[in-house]
């Protein structure tokens, strides 16, 4: 792979040697399981005529990546193996975005990779769910997959980074009595040699799990790059443990559960680094601006509202630039998105920012909002209702999703509810963009228009 020998890690060997019909892998991010899925399915398709495998991913891009990996693995097999008995490099029959197949008909073996859909029905095949905990309607798809493995030696494999202590992935991973048929693999970051200081890898395999505290573990065994990744979570310990330590987040105090968040995540929506200037809106556009307080970051969120009452997040951007640079960026973003409403956190430093926006951005509906417990409670409860009824969606933006899950509802001494999270700038930017002061945005003229 990538012109270098492909060496299997111990956890990959364990997985490939697991002959269970039902397998579950609870894993860290970026540890190479897409490659292992590709390797296992290519090997089977190469040596077993009429073999079928169906790989289900969270979106079309992820699905296409699996086929690309399978193709690369196939082409890495030396041509000399085409003449072996049996041939270990069979004829490549199909090589499309969603399918790769080997052997000539009528004994063609195929690997089909698709985004999550009911297309998993029909035919005897091996089924692989990749990032299962992040798939919308996972229970429905899981049930639809069962008939495909009923006969013969077909198998079902579920692989994912974890989310919260809820949902089918958590149930199967944690409840051995209810799902005794599953083998279970837990793979945290310290089992992946790419994330561990080379001379400490063997020690990490033996002792890292016994270290108390994620930060201490990262400092003791992690590479410099992993240190940067850990610091990038900005103190969100639960987020790091979920993404890299195969730990399920406690749902007991979460106001928004992971099940709810996943079902509102549209993984086909692009995660944009910059706003797409060619985007043509079919509704009206609002922008929420949560301004930085001391060590926090400012977050801009662009939302499209449709006539049917639905809303979807199109774009988010965080920054710690100086305020004058943030203001210049907001002006550019308003022009590019043709925003109908801009709602800014007017609390504290936001007062001057909001006044400048109203004065210097003519023709734009700018409103400032002072945060109060009452406003936050109204937004959070309205938002939860919109999530439950499917009226709001967003791309798979990790910071946004983690912060939504991090919001806790606690009761104050004054008997009011308080909504907050350890890091919540993305969340409040989202609330400002979605709801603002609650007034219906009007169609406005735009900067630069006459």
Predicted features by range, described:
Residues 1-22:
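Pre-P-loop entry segment of helicase/translocase ATPase cores
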Residues 103-105, 188, 273-281, 296-346:
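Nucleic-acid-processing active sites and adjacent nucleic-acid-binding tracks
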């Amino acid at each position: 792979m990538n012109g270098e020998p492909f060496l299997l890690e111990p956890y990959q060997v364990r997985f490939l040697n697991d002959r269970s019909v039902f397998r579950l892998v609870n894993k860290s991010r970026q540890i190479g399981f897409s490659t292992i899925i590709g390797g296992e399915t290519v090997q089977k398709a190469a040596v077993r005529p009429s073999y079928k495998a169906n790989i289900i991913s969270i979106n079309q891009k992820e699905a296409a990546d699996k086929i690309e990996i399978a193709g690369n693995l196939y082409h890495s097999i030396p041509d000399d193996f085409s003449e072996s008995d049996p041939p270990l490099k069979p004829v490549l029959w199909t090589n499309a975005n969603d399918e790769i197949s080997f052997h000539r008909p009528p004994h063609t073996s195929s690997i089909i990779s698709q985004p999550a859909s009911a297309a998993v029905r029909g035919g005897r095949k091996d089924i692989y769910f990749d990032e299962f905990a992040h798939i919308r309607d996972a229970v429905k798809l899981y049930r639809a997959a069962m008939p495909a493995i009923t006969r013969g030696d077909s198998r079902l494999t579920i692989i994912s980074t974890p989310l919260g202590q809820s949902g089918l992935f958590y149930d199967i991973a944690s409840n051995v009595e209810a799902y005794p048929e599953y083998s279970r693999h837990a793979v945290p970051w310290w089992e992946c040699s790419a994330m561990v200081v080379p001379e400490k890898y063997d020690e990490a395999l033996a002792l890292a799990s016994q270290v108390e505290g994620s930060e201490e573990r990262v400092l003791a065994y992690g590479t410099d790059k992993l240190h940067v990744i850990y610091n990038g979570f900005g103190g969100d310990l639960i987020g790091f443990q979920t993404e890299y330590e195969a730990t399920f987040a406690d749902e007991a105090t979460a106001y928004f559960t992971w099940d709810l968040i996943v079902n509102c995540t549209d993984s086909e929506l692009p995660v944009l680094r910059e706003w797409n200037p060619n985007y043509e809106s079919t509704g009206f556009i609002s922008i929420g601006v949560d301004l930085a307080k001391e060590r926090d970051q400012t977050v801009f969120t662009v939302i499209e509202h449709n006539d049917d009452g639905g809303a979807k997040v199109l774009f988010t951007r965080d920054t710690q630039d100086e305020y004058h640079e943030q203001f210049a960026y907001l002006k550019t973003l308003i022009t590019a998105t043709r925003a109908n409403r801009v709602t800014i956190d007017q609390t504290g430093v936001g007062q001057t920012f909001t006044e400048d926006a109203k004065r210097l951005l003519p023709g734009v509906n700018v409103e400032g909002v002072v945060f109060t417990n009452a406003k936050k409670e109204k937004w959070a409860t309205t938002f939860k209702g919109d999530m439950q009824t499917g009226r709001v969606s967003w791309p798979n933006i990790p910071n946004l999703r983690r912060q939504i899950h991090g919001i806790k509802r606690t009761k104050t001494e004054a008997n009011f509810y308080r909504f907050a999270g350890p890091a919540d700038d993305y969340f409040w930017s989202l609330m400002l963009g979605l709801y603002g002061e609650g007034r219906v945005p009007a169609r406005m003229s735009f900067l630069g228009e006459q």
